[in-house]
């Protein structure tokens, strides 16, 4: 049947068409069914929605996302026919029943996700199947190969190309913004691509976006990397491993990150960016994505083995995931703290981790036998900050930006300690929730500043954290979460005292 396109003032991040009830019945369609939409020699697969109020017979409604993605306008006349359920759904059902994927099956699933053939519900089933049943290393390797095959790739004709990545989940984990320019200052090429926030209040791309443009194409990434030594860009616009961003979007809704998917996400992006040497950060902690050292070692060994099979040299580092890295959580707050570190105004664990990860790459590539010391020498010479400013300028930012120039939310609230002792535990999930409720990462100036970290002494009335927001109502909501979640556990050296049959806390 032929239909005239009608654009609707809606935006959903999926490919869909809206048909009238009569037209849907004529085609034998129900909500959620698929159709093939053809016009001008092109075609795409879309989900069906049905509306009797907004769409007349003979019209096919599309939201702005579908119109932009598929180059549709109201002048378009399209042909719509039912589209059969893809074979990839059968393969997902097979995994749910406990079977192992074949190479061609995982390739078909990833292809279907990349081309928007699978619905969000079916992608959810894929995620749940791999979370519940798990995946063997060869299945993960096939998934990575399929993700890279259908996407863009950066190809460098010269130089040693390296990269770094964290599996995420840790608030404030912005070591890349310091480590990347340190590595680039040593003469290595580092085309760093990263995701936006998934479970935290800011991803690497969100923080870098405060200072520079992160929406770069593959050609721009190559050009800037060859010009100044590195970039820090958002992965999605590059077209590298396009299935990854689509899987991540659904994982976020499910609040799930299956470990096989973490491995595939990281290594597919690194392969697509042209890297040959990769350093992987694996935060370990009770509320982190990897809960203990034993699980972390297994995760690290699997990543190194899969990397080796993909001709990718991978080194891993198990790092402290029990508390935030640095003290700032949220895009602008983190950007300001990164600049404060590079301007030599503050030190601490953010700097130490940044130099440690950079040092791993220096040792992998033979630049130094003691990578950490080499990284520190570069940092203390001022070359890290100098190179960072070059990267910011190359990505369209202000190369003279200073920490005090970074604007943060003007609505604030400080939570104070009600008792004395020392910080015994910090709930990173609670801090993430407080910062996100305050508006991060969408509101760049929103987030949390942590005044006290583990092991630090606390007196009654001492500030524990300050919430920043751009909107008063979001600040109020974040305060409510902060008062409910109890992100800090404070105790004395004596946790409880027992005397004559009674307990005292």
Curated annotation (Swiss-Prot):
GO biological process, one term: pyrimidine nucleobase metabolic process
Record's catalysed reaction(s): AMP + phosphate = alpha-D-ribose 1,5-bisphosphate + adenine; CMP + phosphate = cytosine + alpha-D-ribose 1,5-bisphosphate; UMP + phosphate = alpha-D-ribose 1,5-bisphosphate + uracil
A Pfam cross-reference name: Glycos_transf_3
Entry keyword set: Glycosyltransferase, Transferase
GO cellular component: cytosol
GO MF annotation list: 1,4-alpha-oligoglucan phosphorylase activity; AMP binding; pentosyltransferase activity
InterPro entries for the chain: AMP_phosphorylase, Glycosyl_Trfase_fam3, Glycosyl_Trfase_fam3_N_dom, Glycosyl_Trfase_fam3_N_dom_sf, Nuc_phospho_transferase, PYNP-like_C_sf, PYNP_C, Pyrmidine_PPase_CS
SMART domains in the cross-refs: PYNP_C
E.C. no: 2.4.2.57
Residues binding AMP, per UniProt: 169, 195-200, 204, 265, 289
Enzyme class label: transferase
Highest rank taxon of the organism: Archaea
HAMAP family membership: AMP_phosphorylase
Job description of the protein: Catalyzes the conversion of AMP and phosphate to adenine and ribose 1,5-bisphosphate (R15P). Exhibits phosphorylase activity toward CMP and UMP in addition to AMP. Functions in an archaeal AMP degradation pathway, together with R15P isomerase and RubisCO.
Similarity-based family: Belongs to the thymidine/pyrimidine-nucleoside phosphorylase family. Type 2 subfamily.
Protein name: AMP phosphorylase 2
Taxonomic lineage from the root: Archaea, Methanobacteriati, Methanobacteriota, Archaeoglobi, Archaeoglobales
